[in-house]
Amino acid sequence: MNFFDLHCDTLYKAVTEKSELDNPSYEVKLNNNSKSHRLQCYAIWLPDTLDGNEAEKLFFESADYLKSECNRLGIELLGIGEFTDNAFSKYRNSAFFTVENGKALNGRIENVKRFAELGVRIMTL
C-alpha cells in the first residue's frame, strides 16, 4: 500500500529544538515495510511574528537540515521533475519539501527559483 501525507510540521519542531527528525516524541514514522511506499510532505512552518529576513534565514536553515536528515535516514528528497510515480515505484521513504508561509521569500522573486532548486514543491502564501 502507498501512503501520501500532505502535511507534517515536525520539521519546524526538529529545527527549532535542534533535535533529530525521527525523535520518538515527534510525528514522523518511517516506513520499514518493503512492500509499501510512503511519501511525506515536510513543511517548514514560519510564524507570522518573524520578519522577512528571519523567515528567509529559518527557511534556508531548514532546507539544509532536511537534506541532512533525509540522507541520514535514507529518505529520498524528491527534486525537480520527480513526482509521486517515482516515489511510489522506486523509494520506500520519500519526501517533498513544503513551506507554510510565503514570507520566506522575503520579497525576493529570485527566491522562487532558489526554493524550487532546493526541492520545494508546495508553498502557502
Regions found by a protein language model. Give the residues of each.
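N-terminal hydrophobic targeting/anchoring segments and the immediately downstream early-domain regions
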Residues: 1-125
